[in-house]
């Protein structure tokens, strides 16, 4: 069977929008900054904020505070840099909270991925080969697009045994909104395509879809898609 599958760009819609509080202390060479971040990566936040301010990393502390979910949407920097720079220059605590509209516009979305898939099985319904070419729209900036497409490539074989695999996934930059981390991290889009062709093959082979999957599912000791042993 041969088919093209396409997924859409999706918004995380986490409960609370991005919010940051930055509090400066001291003066001159002793000046430091404590940032309360609702993000997902305190070390990356610290490093990026220090670079924005042009100071040593040791002068910036980032503390993660509880938030109403993120699902990958707060993995990239959002308003941490804005709050930090304003607090540093003004010498006063600064809090920056995005509106829902600002949040929608600013943070990365789930990657739309187009997957051209060719797959086959023998007359008994045993999977033979899988050929996939996937392109992910990462938008104008890279974010973690390369890793998302790497994960998509690793998961597109699904939990099945294939006699032959030929898989290539590419993250491309476009003039569309930026895409990055989203729960599943590329595996969701890949599995949508995989399970689609499994259904098509089962129908052509005249085998119940559940039985077809049971016949081909990996078991302990099998080597599957990414080369890992189950």
Task: Identify the role of each PLM range.
Residues 1-230:
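Structural alpha/beta core scaffold segments of enzyme domains
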């Amino acid at each position: 069977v041969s088919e093209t599958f396409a997924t859409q760009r999706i918004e995380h819609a986490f409960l609370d929008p991005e919010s940051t509080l930055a509090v400066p202390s001291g003066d001159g060479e002793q000046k430091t900054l404590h940032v309360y971040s609702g993000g997902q990566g305190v070390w990356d936040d610290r490093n990026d904020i220090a670079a924005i301010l042009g100071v040593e990393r040791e002068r910036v502390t980032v503390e993660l505070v509880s938030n109403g979910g993120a699902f990958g949407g707060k993995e990239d920097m959002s308003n941490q840099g804005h709050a930090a720079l304003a607090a540093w220059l003004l010498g006063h605590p600064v809090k920056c909270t995005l509106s829902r509209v600002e949040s929608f516009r600013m943070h990365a979305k789930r990657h739309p991925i187009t997957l051209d898939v060719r797959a086959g099985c023998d007359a008994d319904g045993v999977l033979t080969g899988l050929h996939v070419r996937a392109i992910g729209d990462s938008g104008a900036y890279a974010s973690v697009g390369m890793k998302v497409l790497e994960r998509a490539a690793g998961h597109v074989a699904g939990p099945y045994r294939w006699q032959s695999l030929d898989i290539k996934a590419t993250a491309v930059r476009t003039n569309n909104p930026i895409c990055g981390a989203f729960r599943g991290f590329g595996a969701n889009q890949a599995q949508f395509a995989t399970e689609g062709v499994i259904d098509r093959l089962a129908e052509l082979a005249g085998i119940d879809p559940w039985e077809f999957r049971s016949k081909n599912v990996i078991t302990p000791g099998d080597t599957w898609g990414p080369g890992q042993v189950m």
